[in-house]
C-alpha cells in the first residue's frame, strides 16, 4: 500500500479508517474523521522528516504500516524536540510517539508502550583517534569527562544512575548539537543510540565511534511505539497487528534502507519485562 506521509503543512490526508471497535481519545478522533497524529523528533534512521518533508525512519515506517494493516491511513506527522515528545503526548498534541523511544521504567509511568519494535545499544562518539580512550559510561565516569547527549534521552538517566555528575552531562536538543559540541572540544564524548552514532561517525571525519563491545550490558534497550494510558483498547489492537507484521519479509524490506536488520529484532522481550528491568 502506498501511504502519503506529508507534514502538517500539507494538510489532512483523506483516507478511510477502520470501523470503531476500541474506546479512548484516539478512537474518538478516528470516529470523528480526524487524523492520527504521530509525534517524533529529528533522529536519523529512527524517526525524522526527510528532505521531501515526509515522515521517515524505521520506527515511523513500522508504525505507519501497522496502522495501515488496521485500515487506518489518515496519518498526520508532527515533528518536535525529543524532550517534548512525552509532554506532547500527554497534552494531546499528538496521539502516538513514533520516534524510536526506549521502554524504560521511568517512562512507563507516563506512557503505555506497544510491544518492542527494535533493540539497540547505546553508542559513544569521540574525537578521531579516541585520544581519551572513552568507550563506555564507566570510562566517562572514571575519567571525569564531559559527555554530551540529548535532552530527554535515556542516556541522561543512565549516566546519572552510574554516578556521573550532572555537571559532566551536557544536554542539547539533538544529534546536530552533539556533534558540534564534540568537534568544538566542549565535550569529550557524545552518547546516543548505536544506530545514530554509527550514522554520524560515517558522515564526519573528525569523529569516530567508540568500541561498542565495551559498553555496559545494561545499556542495551528496546524501543516501542508510545501511547497514552487512556488508549489501552486501541493499543491492544495495535499490538495484535504488530505481531503479524514484525519481522516479516515485507517489513524487513521496508526498513532495510534505515540499516535495520534481523540483529535489531526484539526477540522474545516484552514491554512488561522492559518496564520492570530498564
Q: What is each of the regions a protein language model found here?
A:
Residues 24-100, 109:
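Extracytoplasmic small-molecule ligand-binding "clamshell" domains
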Residues 25, 154-169, 208-210, 242-278:
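Ligand-binding clefts/hinges and TM-proximal coupling segments of bilobed small-molecule sensing domains
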Residues 36-37, 72-74, 91-99, 144-146, ...:
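Alpha-to-beta junction loops
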Residues 37, 42-45, 53-69, 123-174, ...:
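Bilobed "Venus flytrap"/periplasmic-binding protein-like clamshell domains
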Residues 57-70, 130, 138, 144, ...:
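Extended ligand-binding regions for polar small-molecule ligands
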Residues 75-87, 132-135, 169-184:
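Short helix-initiation/N-cap motifs at beta->coil->alpha
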Residues 84, 100-109, 160-161, 188-219:
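A ligand-binding cleft/hinge motif common to bilobed small-molecule-binding domains
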Residues 119-125, 202-242, 261-278:
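Periplasmic-binding protein-like
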Amino acid at each position: 500500500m502506498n501511504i502519503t506521509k506529508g507534514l502538517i503543512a500539507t494538510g489532512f490526508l483523506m483516507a478511510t479508517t477502520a470501523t470503531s471497535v476500541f474506546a479512548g481519545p484516539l478512537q474518538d478522533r478516528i470516529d470523528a474523521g480526524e487524523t492520527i497524529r504521530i509525534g517524533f523528533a529529528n533522529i536519523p534512521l529512527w524517526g525524522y522528516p526527510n528532505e521531501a518533508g515526509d515522515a521517515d525512519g524505521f520506527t515511523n515506517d513500522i508504525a505507519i504500516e501497522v496502522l495501515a494493516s488496521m485500515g487506518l491511513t489518515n496519518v498526520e506527522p508532527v515533528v518536535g524536540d525529543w524532550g517534548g515528545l512525552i509532554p506532547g503526548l500527554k497534552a494531546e498534541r499528538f496521539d502516538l510517539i513514533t520516534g524510536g523511544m526506549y521502554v524504560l521504567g521511568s517512562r512507563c509511568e507516563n506512557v503505555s508502550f506497544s510491544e518492542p519494535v527494535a533493540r539497540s545499544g547505546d553508542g559513544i562518539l569521540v574525537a578521531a583517534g579516541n585520544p581519551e580512550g572513552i568507550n563506555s559510561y564507566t570510562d566517562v565516569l572514571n575519567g571525569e569527562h564531559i559527555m554530551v547527549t540529548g535532552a530527554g534521552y535515556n542516556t541522561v538517566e543512565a549516566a546519572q544512575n552510574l554516578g556521573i555528575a550532572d555537571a559532566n552531562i551536557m544536554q542539547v536538543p539533538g544529534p546536530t548539537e552533539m556533534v558540534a559540541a564534540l568537534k568544538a572540544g566542549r565535550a569529550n564524548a557524545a552518547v546516543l543510540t548505536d544506530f545514530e552514532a554509527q550514522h554520524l561517525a560515517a558522515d564526519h571525519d573528525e569523529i569516530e565511534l567508540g568500541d561498542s563491545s565495551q559498553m555496559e550490558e545494561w545499556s542495551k534497550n528496546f524501543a516501542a511505539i508510545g501511547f497514552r494510558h487512556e488508549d489501552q483498547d486501541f493499543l491492544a489492537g495495535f499490538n495484535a497487528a504488530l505481531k503479524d507484521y514484525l519481522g516479516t519479509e515485507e517489513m524487513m524490506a521496508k526498513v532495510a534502507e534505515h540499516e535495520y536488520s534481523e540483529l535489531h529484532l526484539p526477540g522474545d522481550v516484552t514491554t512488561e519485562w522492559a518496564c520492570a528491568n530498564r
